Each structure stands twice: as structure tokens, then as C-alpha cells.
UniProtKB/Swiss-Prot annotation:
Interacts with the regulatory subunit KefG. The lineage of its organism: Bacteria, Pseudomonadati, Pseudomonadota, Gammaproteobacteria, Enterobacterales. NCBIfam families: 2a37 (TIGR00932), PRK03659.1 (NF002973). It comes from the Bacteria. Its main location: membrane. Residues 400-519 form the RCK N-terminal domain. GO terms for biological process: proton transmembrane transport. GO terms for cellular component: plasma membrane. It is found in: Cell inner membrane. The chain crosses the membrane at residues 4-24, 29-49, 55-75, 87-107, 115-135, 152-172, 177-197, 207-227, 230-250, 262-282, 284-304, 324-344, 356-376. This is Glutathione-regulated potassium-efflux system protein KefB. Pore-forming subunit of a potassium efflux system that confers protection against electrophiles. Catalyzes K(+)/H(+) antiport. Belongs to the monovalent cation:proton antiporter 2 (CPA2) transporter (TC 2.A.37) family. KefB subfamily. Disulfide bonds: none annotated.
Length: 601
């Protein structure tokens, strides 16, 4: 595709997305179905604006690659090990059972047994991109059904390797002598990637983070994702699997949230491109010619996979209200079918329009999933109105923070220690990489990143947290963060550090009433001790401290609308005279009751 054609295609993709997705959302059919319909409209079987579908479809697979990297970031190796039973148990059972049933049904038509086997395996796979997108939209990520769904998708990615290796064997074109040397080299290369990633990625990102240039960090993240995808593709393995492994290797690093933030915009755009490309690939000519065959095939495919998945969910012990969600979200065909069926076609396993029929079936099955999930939602809403089963409780990984602490210098560390000592779940965001490395050694959950990025706050748990404590060194960052929280996370209770009186004024103007002036409190405490050292009774000095604090806060509030220096000086003189009168009355009262302690606010 030439440069001008590529630019034209880019403009058409953006126009289709901007026009179709908001319309689809307004109609209540979801963004994914909107992308698919937009692809049909601009593709060769629609208005014909774009004809080179295969090249664009291959490029758009990067959306799945970026998505799998982010999924890997959310899973550390220990959690992945905990999922081994569901990955190799339920995942393997789903692929084998679905493939056997679907292959048997294909053999009842004109498919040879070899073509039926490949067709059954390809149709047994689900769309990673669509399933994960729908699981996020439905809030399934932290549910048991969502975890099981991810396990099934992960096994399907692993099954790509033997499935592709099976094609030449079924076609009878496999080499007589198996090339063990070539296989050994691939295994060594894969092991080298794991070892290198395990010991090199953190030091490399630490070096890049020390530069303090955000654009370089983003470039390094893109290099990691695309490089690992290209490396796995060169080995003949799944690109998505490679980036997933890279994500897992960085899941426990302090850069996790910053990596998510850097990747997320690219992931969203490329996923949209992928769904548009799938819509463009729909061959309306084959659909029109074999309408009955395709319609029956789509219904049978969705029904078989839904039934298999539902039964496996029941055997696994998924609660009844989540089984249909789990089955429905994985009921479609997947993007891997395009790769597998193209490989099989090059080996002449399919005859006539067989490959086109299968691809049309896969594409239409993807379009049924958002509609099926809407039906499941309606069914669930009726089910949830009934009495709950006492033994069934929602499974939630309760690691969401109660408090987000922004900045972990000396001020923030004191707050963090107090919160952790009282068993509060906190997530800390810090831009000083040396502080991040130091605090992580002491068991703090500290992450490297710029907290003024909305997506970073969201991925750090701002939507679930109750409070945010802002201890930034720069007043500009503090005020920007307050504005972001007010706009995007209005439920958060904002507490902030004010370095001085000016910043305290700005916080009050922004509506933040819970703040602490770092020098004010410590200076006031030292002043109280000074009064005691000069002979004042301790409780009298305590009262003096309290009155001074109250009056100072009142002055702050009254001076907010006053901007001239003369007005502030005049008001400060009045406050000083008022404070002297208060102290005079207190001293007279204390002479009558020197040993009494008052309760004060």
C-alpha cells in the first residue's frame, strides 16, 4: 500500500469510527458491533473505499498484541500459577470438546475429514479481542467467571502452535525428517527471551525512567511490545503470546501503571482498527449465495460453544448467575481462524468456497456476541430479582486501594506509615525512581508514574478508592491533580499538602478544605513548647495553640476574595489584635483554674 493510499485508508478508518461508534452506542448495540458495521460499510463489499483488506487485517492484529501486553501486566507469575488448573483443565477441555463436535458436524457436509479437523479447531477458538473487551464492559474482570474466561483464552493462544503444526501433517506435505535442530534453536531462543526479560527489563526501564523524559519511556514501551511480537513471529509462534509474557515479566515491577498508561491509547485505536478490518473482510457475495448454509452454521457454532462452555462452567463450580455470561462472551469464532484457515488453504485442504464460508461464519458469529450479551444481561436482571443462594458469594480479588497517596517523600512517607500501621490498603504514586526502589524494599506498594495522567490514576484504582492524599512537591502539580480528581473522580475525598499560605489559599478556592501546611503545624507545635519553657502552664499553652490555629484558618477563609497586599496587611493587624484579646481573657481565666484541662475541638 503506497503512502497516499495509506493516508486515505487512515482517514477513512477514523471517519468510520467517529461516525459509527457513537451511533452504535446511542442505539445500545455497543462499540464493538459499531466497529464491525463500519468495516462492512467502507469495505470492498460495501461502499468500496478500501480494497486491500488482507494487509490491513494483518496490521490491525497489533491491537490484540497491545491488549495481551496489558493483560499480562495485570497478572504476576504467582497469580498465573494459581490459574494453571483452569488454563490446562477448562481451557483444554473447551478446545477439544468444541473442536470434536464442530469437526463432526462439518464432516456431515462436503468437508473432507482433514478439512473438518482444521475447521473444527479454528471454530473452537474465541476472539481474544472481543471477549476481553466485553468482559471489561460487563465488569467481569475480577469475577470468577472472568478469571475462568481469561484462562480459556490463554490456553487458546497456547494452542495456536500445535494447530499450525498440524496443517502440513493433515495435508500430507510434512517433511519426512523432523528438523530437531530447528526446533531446538526455537526453544533456546524462547528460553533466552524469558531469562533476558526476567533480569534485564527492570534495569533498562530504571535507566530510562532516570532520564525524566516521558516520551522516551513511551517509546521504550512501544519498542518492548513490538519487539517481542516480532521476535515471536520470527519463531513461528503467536505474537500475542510473546507480548503477554513480556507483560507478565513486568507485572510486579514499579513501572506497571506507567506502562499501562503509555500503551492504552495505542491499544484502543488498534483494537478499533482490528474490528473494522474484520467487518471489511465479510464476503457479502458468499453470504448472499449460501445464505441458508451460513445462517445455520452461525446458529450451530454459537449454540455448540455456548453449551460446551456452560457445562464446563457448571463442572468448575461457577455460580449459576455467572455461567451464561461466561458462555456467551466466548461463544463466537476468533481472529485465529483467519490465520489457520489461510494456512490450510495454502496447503489445499479446502475446496471451492469452503474457506470463504468458514470465514463468513466466524465474522457473523462475532457480530452476534454483543447482541447475545444484551440478552444475557436482560436474563440476569430478571434472575437477580429472585432470592440469592446463601452459599453463593461473589468472588472478588479485594486488592483495590482505599487510599491513593501521591508523592512519597518525607511528608508522604509519614502518612503512608500511619495508614499501613492501621491496616489500610494504599497505592502510592511517585515520580522519583530512587524513592520507588527504596520504599519497595520495605514492602510498600509503590509505583513509578506521573499522577497527573488521568489513565494512570484510573489504572491505579482511583475509581474504587475512597480518598486521595496529595503530597506533591510542586504546587502546580497539586492544583492540577485536584482539578483532575474533581472532573474525573468526583467521589474521591481529597486531602492535600500545602507548602505555604499561598498554596493553602489556592486549595480553599478549589474547594479543598482538608489540607495541612507542613511548616505551620510543626512551627505551631514548637511554639507551644516554647511557651511552656517560658513558664506558661501546659494546658494554657495548648489553648493558645488551638486559638491561634482557629483564627489563622478563619483568616485564610476571609482573605480568599481579597487580592491586594494592603487589604491583607490590614486584616492581619486586626487578627493580631483579636488574638491578643483572646489570650488576655484566657490568662485571666487560667489564673482562676490553673490545673484544669478543657476539652476542645
Amino acid at each position: 500500500m503506497e503512502g497516499s493510499d495509506l493516508l486515505t485508508a487512515g482517514v477513512m478508518f477514523l471517519f468510520a469510527a467517529v461516525a459509527a461508534v457513537p451511533l452504535a452506542s446511542r442505539l445500545g448495540i455497543g462499540a464493538v458491533l459499531g466497529y464491525l458495521l463500519a468495516g462492512i460499510a467502507i469495505g470492498p463489499w460495501g461502499l468500496g473505499f478500501i480494497s486491500d483488506v488482507d494487509e490491513i487485517l494483518h496490521f490491525s492484529e497489533l491491537g490484540v498484541v497491545f491488549l495481551m501486553f496489558i493483560i499480562g501486566l495485570e497478572l504476576n507469575p504467582s497469580k498465573l500459577w494459581q490459574l494453571r488448573r483452569s488454563i490446562f483443565g477448562v481451557g483444554a477441555a473447551q478446545v477439544m470438546l468444541s473442536a470434536v463436535v464442530l469437526a463432526g458436524l462439518l464432516m456431515l457436509t462436503d468437508f473432507s475429514w482433514q478439512a473438518a479437523v482444521i475447521g473444527g479447531i479454528g471454530l473452537a477458538m474465541s476472539s481474544t479481542a472481543m471477549a476481553l473487551q466485553l468482559m471489561r464492559e460487563k465488569g467481569m474482570n475480577r469475577s470468577e467467571s472472568g478469571q475462568l474466561g481469561f484462562s480459556v483464552l490463554l490456553f487458546q493462544d497456547l494452542a495456536v502452535i500445535p494447530a499450525l503444526a498440524l496443517v502440513p501433517l493433515l495435508a500430507g506435505s510434512a517433511d519426512e525428517h523432523f528438523d530437531w535442530i530447528k526446533v531446538g534453536m526455537k526453544v533456546l531462543a524462547f528460553a533466552g527471551m524469558l531469562i533476558g526479560g526476567r533480569y534485564l527489563l527492570r534495569p533498562v526501564f530504571r535507566f530510562i525512567a532516570d532520564s525524566g523524559v516521558r516520551e522516551v519511556f513511551t517509546a521504550a514501551t512501544l519498542l518492548l511490545v513490538l519487539g517481542s511480537a516480532l521476535f515471536m513471529d520470527a519463531l513461528g509462534l503467536s505474537m500475542a503470546l510473546g507480548t503477554f509474557i513480556a507483560g507478565v515479566l513486568l507485572a510486579e515491577s514499579e513501572y506497571r501503571h506507567e506502562l499501562e498508561t503509555a500503551i492504552d491509547p495505542f491499544k484502543g485505536l488498534l483494537l478499533g482498527l482490528f474490528f473494522i478490518s474484520v467487518g471489511m473482510s465479510l464476503n457479502l457475495g458468499v453470504l448472499y449465495t449460501h445464505l441458508l448454509w451460513v445462517a445455520v452454521s452461525v446458529i450451530v457454532l454459537v449454540a455448540v460453544k455456548t453449551l460446551v462452555l456452560y457445562l464446563l462452567a457448571r463442572l468448575y463450580g461457577i455460580r449459576s448467575s455467572e455461567r451464561m455470561q461466561f458462555a456467551g462472551v466466548l461463544s463466537q469464532g476468533g481472529e485465529f481462524a483467519f490465520v489457520l484457515f489461510s494456512t490450510a488453504s495454502s496447503q489445499r485442504l479446502f475446496q471451492g468456497d469452503q474457506m470463504s464460508l468458514l470465514l463468513v461464519t466466524v465474522t457473523l458469529s462475532m457480530m452476534t456476541t454483543p447482541l447475545l450479551m444484551k440478552l444475557v444481561d436482560k436474563w440476569l436482571s430478571r434472575q437477580l430479582n429472585g432470592p440469592e443462594e446463601e452459599d453463593e458469594k461473589p468472588w472478588v480479588d479485594d486488592d483495590k486501594p482505599q487510599v491513593i497517596v501521591v508523592g512519597f517523600g518525607r511528608f508522604g512517607q509519614v502518612i503512608g506509615r500511619l495508614l499501613m500501621a492501621n491496616k489500610m490498603r494504599i497505592t502510592v504514586l511517585e515520580r522519583d525512581i530512587s524513592a520507588v526502589n527504596l520504599m519497595r524494599k520495605y514492602g510498600y506498594k509503590v509505583y513509578y508514574g506521573d499522577a497527573t495522567q488521568v489513565e494512570l490514576l484510573r489504572s491505579a484504582g482511583a475509581e474504587a478508592a475512597e480518598s486521595i492524599v496529595i503530597t506533591c512537591n510542586e504546587p502546580e502539580d497539586t492544583m492540577k491533580l485536584v482539578e483532575i480528581c474533581r472532573q474525573h473522580f468526583p467521589h474521591l475525598h481529597i486531602l492535600a499538602r500545602a507548602r505555604g499560605r499561598v498554596e493553602a489559599h489556592e486549595l480553599l478556592q478549589a474547594g479543598v478544605t482538608q489540607f495541612s501546611r507542613e511548616t505551620f503545624s510543626s512551627a505551631l507545635e514548637l511554639g507551644r513548647k516554647t511557651l511552656v519553657s517560658l513558664g506558661m502552664h501546659p494546658h494554657q499553652a495548648q489553648r493558645a495553640q488551638l486559638h491561634f490555629r482557629r483564627l489563622d484558618m478563619r483568616m485564610l477563609r476571609e482573605l480568599i476574595p481579597m487580592h491586594t497586599d494592603m487589604v491583607q496587611i490590614s486584616r492581619a493587624r486586626e487578627a493580631r489584635r483579636e488574638l491578643e484579646e483572646i489570650f488576655q481573657r484566657e490568662m485571666q481565666q487560667e489564673r482562676r483554674q490553673l490545673d484544669g484541662w478543657d476539652e476542645f475541638e
